[in-house]
UniProtKB/Swiss-Prot annotation:
S-adenosyl-L-methionine binds at G111, I131, G132, D133, Y134, V135, L136. One of its GO terms (biological process) is tRNA N1-guanine methylation. SUPFAM superfamilies: alpha/beta knot. The gene is trmD. CDD domains: TrmD-like. Its EC number is 2.1.1.228. It comes from Staphylococcus haemolyticus (strain JCSC1435). Keywords: Cytoplasm, Methyltransferase, S-adenosyl-L-methionine, Transferase, tRNA processing. It is an enzyme of class 2 (transferase). The keyword S-adenosyl-L-methionine applies. It catalyses: guanosine(37) in tRNA + S-adenosyl-L-methionine = N(1)-methylguanosine(37) in tRNA + S-adenosyl-L-homocysteine + H(+). This is tRNA (guanine-N(1)-)-methyltransferase. Pfam families: tRNA_m1G_MT (PF01746). GO terms for molecular function: tRNA (guanine(37)-N1)-methyltransferase activity. It is found in: Cytoplasm.
Amino acid sequence: MKIDYLTLFPEMFDGVLNHSILKRAQDKEIISVNTVNFRDYAINKHNQVDDYPFGGGQGMVLKPEPVFNAMKDLQRTDQTRVILMCPQGRPFSQEIAQELSEAEHIVFICGHYEGYDERIRTHLVTDEISIGDYVLTGGELPAMTMTDAIVRLIPGVLGNQQSHQDDSFSDGLLEFPQYTRPREFENMTVPDVLLSGNHANIEQWRHEQKLIRTYHKRPDLLDRYPLTEDDEKFIESYKKQLKNN
């Protein structure tokens, strides 16, 4: 996978891209990354990339020329996903991360001003994505967040593919509780089932714990999760148990 970032602050990506999983993915040549400072593509002597909005209003608007010119130098195809980081976009999710992990080329357009000239949105962008209902200074941090979520799903990036399959949201539920040594710590003990060696019982316990966690912390996810008849019975039994306690 090739990933390009159009940004006014390419140095912001250095720390994220040069450590941990993203660094290893590059070392394995599974991904290649490239930052492009689109200020280099400004068309006047002052390297101006923003201007006042037509019709008046607060703030500045990102000009179309630098972004269009920078995009011309990228080797795009019809399959290239050009992502605009903006609060108007569809909310980022594990499902979108999985979808984008299958792309061969992704371009992130990271703005840093009040808004974008609409022609950028309508003529260059394939996807508008938001990472939440809040405002950030620019699109760099959302692009980094998305990159991490996407790349770890590409086969071969993680040492153990089962790692991401057990993560929260990978199957629509939150992750089950995990424990390691020591077995007992300050009078807190590991559940016996995890030490039983019975893999079927362990898997059942983990699934039930995922249902419990999701019920308490993200009940909205259960509305979209394909609950089995056994799942529904377990949840009802758990609700009754809570009332009795």
